[in-house]
């Protein structure tokens, strides 16, 4: 079987599996977030944290709960890393010292669902920090994104109310009823596929082919690997992430990890459709996500398999930075999945991709990670773009835009526009400051267009809460740890505040009956229009700097 055929088969099987499970999982999540019953474990948690599960919150109260939970999580994880040398299961001789700047960057990274790593995981973080700190945040940060998405959906579904649900109930249910059961199943499948799960520190000594002895770190990898992909987190137990054979040993586990990445983001549109009372609306949102994803992944695969150049031509594809057990095509699919969502996990080295292949991974994030996007964040980002599309369509026909019976007034469009502009502002401002500082330019391992691409990728990844990297710059410095940490905080929390404000505004409205002039938002025309509006907006925003970076490199 040729690499191209194998890649197409890999992609087709993923699409088929996602299509098969997204309806039952979406329906299950609908029941989770609309149920009036609490389990015994949930009631115990509510008593411990002092939450009233029957008390509803306004958008402001919901937002304050998100901010408070995130702040406490950052402080806890920051402190846990700094004192890990006094805790059980710590590394006796870590390769990278845990400075306050690095601890801040890492704490913010995992709390914001980014999982940007300026360190090598297996030689820096002890097992207790990995389990009680990083893995826990992999669960709760994903649940926060899902909770915010559900709050926005309630804004569309409810009428004449200021209440969006209860953040603490949404957080607990998302973890106990959705993420934890799926992660357990995923971890067991990964262990069956060869991923490791132990408490070895640096005790595994093996003999290499040359006869030398090599010490290989172990750890509780499979448990963290499952939620890393399922929650679209992406932070690896090992420095090389899912390229490491202990994390992702075989083509089967590679397929499974890809499937876990896409599972919840593609199922949430079904949940959305059920909650607003029109399954067709969910199908339309899923179709938009799917169209963007298929186009991006196919183009990335083509650019990696057929790119010009002496070495790629000689070997038949761009094999640099690619694991032979996966191959170019499967790696390109994984790269597309991980950057179209907010995952950021990698099974190949994006910095070694062809210039235009690397451009695709960056452009996926600059789209706002909406095809299908992160767990929760992909759905609310897609709904924001649907609102903008409805507004543009309303301008063309001269009528007040409506979406799902809710009028898109100046307040709603201002919030939607602010959401769309927030992340590009962080990306472009951060990149400009980094390139303007001689000290930061000195940390670049490459110059010219590719050097600019590496800096742009770093801020694109952190501001969009992705976490993958081109890795050609030295980011474990006080400036980069601080600057990228701020990009992650503002890139996560500012959009969440705007989404919740929009949800509150929509929930306060009644429903306008459909008329002859109402734009149908469940038909193929709307799907195509939304894809077009998205591409145009992103191109207008990022084309100038992309022309100086990966496009210039590709043309050269």
From Swiss-Prot:
Keyword annotations of the record: Cell membrane, Ion transport, Membrane, Potassium, Potassium transport, Transmembrane, Transmembrane helix, Transport
* Primary localization: membrane
What Pfam families does this protein's entry cite? KdpA (PF03814)
- Report the GO molecular function annotations: P-type potassium transmembrane transporter activity; potassium ion binding
Q: How does it sit in the membrane?
A: Multi-pass membrane protein
Q: Name one GO cellular component term.
A: plasma membrane
Which compartments does it reside in? Cell membrane
Question: What residue ranges are annotated as transmembrane?
Answer: 6-26, 65-85, 133-153, 176-196, 249-269, 283-303, 378-398, 415-435, 483-503, 526-546
Q: Cross-referenced InterPro entries, in alphabetical order?
A: KdpA (IPR004623)
Highest taxon of the lineage: Bacteria
- Cite the record's note on assembly: The system is composed of three essential subunits: KdpA, KdpB and KdpC.
Q: Which family does it belong to?
A: Belongs to the KdpA family.
What role does it play? Part of the high-affinity ATP-driven potassium transport (or Kdp) system, which catalyzes the hydrolysis of ATP coupled with the electrogenic transport of potassium into the cytoplasm. This subunit binds the extracellular potassium ions and delivers the ions to the membrane domain of KdpB through an intramembrane tunnel.
Q: Which PANTHER family match?
A: POTASSIUM-TRANSPORTING ATPASE A CHAIN, POTASSIUM-TRANSPORTING ATPASE POTASSIUM-BINDING SUBUNIT
The name of this protein is Potassium-transporting ATPase potassium-binding subunit
């Amino acid at each position: 079987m040729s690499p191209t055929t194998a890649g197409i088969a890999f992609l087709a099987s993923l699409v088929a599996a996602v299509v098969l499970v997204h309806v039952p999982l979406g329906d299950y999540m609908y029941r989770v977030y609309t149920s009036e019953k609490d389990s015994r474990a949930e009631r115990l948690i509510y008593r411990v944290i002092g939450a009233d599960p029957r008390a509803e919150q306004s958008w402001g109260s919901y937002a304050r709960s998100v901010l408070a939970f995130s702040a406490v999580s950052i402080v806890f994880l920051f402190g846990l890393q700094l004192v890990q040398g006094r805790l059980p299961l710590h590394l006796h001789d870590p390769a990278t010292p845990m400075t306050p700047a690095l601890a801040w960057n890492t704490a913010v990274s995992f709390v914001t669902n980014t999982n940007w790593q300026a360190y090598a995981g297996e030689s820096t973080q002890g097992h207790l920090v990995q389990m009680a700190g990083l893995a826990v945040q992999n669960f709760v940060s994903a649940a926060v994104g899902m909770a915010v998405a559900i709050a926005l959906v309630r804004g569309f579904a409810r009428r004449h109310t200021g209440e969006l649900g209860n953040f603490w109930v949404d957080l607990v249910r998302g973890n106990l009823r959705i993420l934890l059961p799926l992660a357990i199943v995923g971890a067991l499948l990964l262990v069956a596929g060869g991923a490791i799960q132990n408490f070895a520190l640096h005790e595994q000594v093996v003999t290499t082919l040359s006869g030398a002895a090599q010490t290989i770190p172990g750890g509780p990898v499979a448990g963290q690997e499952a939620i890393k992909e399922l929650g679209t987190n992406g932070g690896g137990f090992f420095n090389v992430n899912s390229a490491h054979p202990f994390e992702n040993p075989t083509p089967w586990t590679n397929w499974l990890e890809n499937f876990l990445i896409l599972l919840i983001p593609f199922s949430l549109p079904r949940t959305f459709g059920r909650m607003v009372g029109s399954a067709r609306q969910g199908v339309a949102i899923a179709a938009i996500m799917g169209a963007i994803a298929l186009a991006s992944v196919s183009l990335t695969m083509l650019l990696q398999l057929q790119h010009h150049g002496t070495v790629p031509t000689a070997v038949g594809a761009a094999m640099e930075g690619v694991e032979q057990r996966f191959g170019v095509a499967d790696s390109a699919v994984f790269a597309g999945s991980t950057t179209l969502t907010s995952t950021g996990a990698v099974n190949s080295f994006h910095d070694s991709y062809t210039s235009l292949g690397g451009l695709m991974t960056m452009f996926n994030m600059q789209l706002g990670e909406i095809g299908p996007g992160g767990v929760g964040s992909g759905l609310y980002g897609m709904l924001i773009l649907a609102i903008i599309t409805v507004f543009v369509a309303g301008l063309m026909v001269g009528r007040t835009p409506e979406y799902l019976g809710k009028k898109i007034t100046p307040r709603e469009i201002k919030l939607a526009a602010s959401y769309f502009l927030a992340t590009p502002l962080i990306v472009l401002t951060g990149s400009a400051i980094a390139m303007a500082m001689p000290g930061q330019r000195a940390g670049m391992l490459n110059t010219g267009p590719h050097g600019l691409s590496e800096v742009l990728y770093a801020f694109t990844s952190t501001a969009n809460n992705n976490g993958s990297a081109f890795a050609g710059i030295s980011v474990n410095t006080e400036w980069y740890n601080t600057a990228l940490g701020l990009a992650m905080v503002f890139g996560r929390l500012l959009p969440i505040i705007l989404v919740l404000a929009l949800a509150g505004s929509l929930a306060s409205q009644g429903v306008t009956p459909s008329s002859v002039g109402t734009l149908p938002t469940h038909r193929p025309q709307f799907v195509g229009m939304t894809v077009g509006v998205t591409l145009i907006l992103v191109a207008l925003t990022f084309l100038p700097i992309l022309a100086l970076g990966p496009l210039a490199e590709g043309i050269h």
